[in-house]
């Protein structure tokens, strides 16, 4: 699949923009704070209905405006689709072929993207929240039911946490309601956990050989899911629910004392092992970056295996963060089969034939100039 054009209105520093793209490589060049990352973000938001940079949708709307809009034309193997996302203070509304979608979960997954930005290099050494977000965003693209369960889980979690804070003063009168929320949380949380196990099993199958290739056969990558309760992938749903229920009973008083939910998928984490050593703790910077790169390249292949089309790859200021060898491995892997967007302050020093016939887009203060580079 590839996006052939995009239109922006009142998005970040773009008042109005219409732009067409090549189906292979598009290089967006500009100094910092000129709008190149905003353009990249707009493509991501059009696909995912949320930003990878902020959870505050108001930041996506141009200063002093009431709404922002992103439109795009998506070309898939057997169809051409128009996508539209309208952002206002009231929230987001999505349209597919001019038809408004009742839920964003019906819209997400139509256009698949893989974002690789400098912050993704923190996937290994960053906080558990970074890794959970990685799971949620990638799983949501290929499993709409996961997004539904996640949204329901988050709603119940918010209600349960509010009740726990209330119970810090007087817990006895609210225990029945707490039990109701706990059972709802277990119901949705169990399904989330099962989907994460399945996804990571597939990701492991793709990421391990990719990592082996980048490390020239010297390293073996293993991905391990670390749930906040004592469950395993081999358990069936009823057993997982049972373990969750017992765990919630054991931490109930602590949760009331602290006013927050202490276990569940929102507290889980991932660990990465290279040659049986925890990369977060014992890995070199090079091993951590190889792991992050392997995961991103694995995402591309995993999405292809699920939807039978390659996703769109967004490389936001990340090439300069990789050494020449990893840079070449990345570009060799995607060459000719994945529509790719690259942002950079300069292409000087990036010698690769993938970029030789790229469409070059120069961004200066929210305006663009384009050229096809055939050098």
Curated annotation (Swiss-Prot):
Keywords: ATP-binding, Cytoplasm, DNA damage, DNA repair, DNA replication, DNA-binding, Nucleotide-binding, SOS response. InterPro entries: DNA-binding_RecF, DNA-binding_RecF_CS, P-loop_NTPase, RecF/RecN/SMC_N, RecF_2. Its main location: cytoplasm. GO terms for biological process: DNA replication; DNA synthesis involved in DNA repair; double-strand break repair; SOS response. It is found in: Cytoplasm. Belongs to the RecF family. This is DNA replication and repair protein RecF. It comes from Bacillus anthracis.
């Amino acid at each position: 699949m590839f996006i052939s054009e995009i239109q922006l209105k009142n998005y970040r520093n773009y008042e109005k923009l219409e732009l067409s793209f090549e189906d292979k490589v598009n290089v967006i060049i500009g100094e910092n704070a000129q709008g190149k990352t905003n353009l990249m973000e707009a493509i991501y938001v059009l696909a995912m209905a949320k930003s990878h940079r902020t959870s505050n949708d108001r930041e996506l709307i141009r200063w002093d405006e009431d709404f922002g809009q992103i439109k795009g034309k998506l070309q898939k193997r057997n169809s051409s689709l128009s996508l539209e996302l309208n952002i206002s203070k009231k929230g987001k509304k999505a349209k597919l072929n001019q038809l408004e979608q009742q839920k964003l979960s019906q819209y997400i997954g139509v256009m698949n993207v893989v974002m690789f930005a400098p912050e993704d290099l923190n996937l290994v050494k960053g906080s558990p929240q970074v890794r959970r977000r990685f799971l949620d965003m990638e799983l949501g693209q290929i499993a709409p039911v996961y997004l539904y369960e996640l949204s329901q889980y988050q709603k119940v979690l918010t209600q349960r946490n509010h009740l726990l804070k209330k119970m810090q003063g007087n817990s006895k009168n609210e225990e029945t309601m707490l039990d109701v929320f706990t059972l709802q949380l277990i119901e949705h949380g169990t399904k989330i956990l099962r989907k994460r196990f399945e996804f990571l099993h597939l990701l492991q199958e793709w990421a391990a050989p990719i990592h082996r290739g980048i490390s020239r056969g010297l390293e073996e990558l293993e991905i391990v899911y670390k749930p906040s309760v004592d469950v395993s992938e081999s358990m069936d749903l009823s057993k997982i629910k049972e373990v969750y229920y017992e765990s919630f009973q054991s931490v109930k008083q602590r949760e009331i004392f602290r006013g927050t939910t202490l276990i569940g998928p929102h507290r889980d984490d991932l660990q990465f092992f290279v040659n049986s050593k925890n990369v977060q703790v014992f890995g070199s910077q090079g091993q951590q970056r190889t792991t992050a790169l392997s995961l991103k390249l694995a995402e591309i292949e995993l999405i292809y295996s699920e939807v039978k089309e390659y996703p769109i790859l967004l490389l936001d200021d990340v090439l300069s963060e990789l050494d020449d060898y990893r840079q070449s491995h990345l570009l060799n892997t995607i060459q000719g089969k994945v529509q790719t967007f690259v942002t950079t302050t300069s292409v000087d020093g990036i010698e690769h034939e993938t970029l030789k016939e790229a469409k070059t887009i120069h961004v200066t203060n929210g305006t663009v100039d384009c050229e096809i580079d055939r050098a």
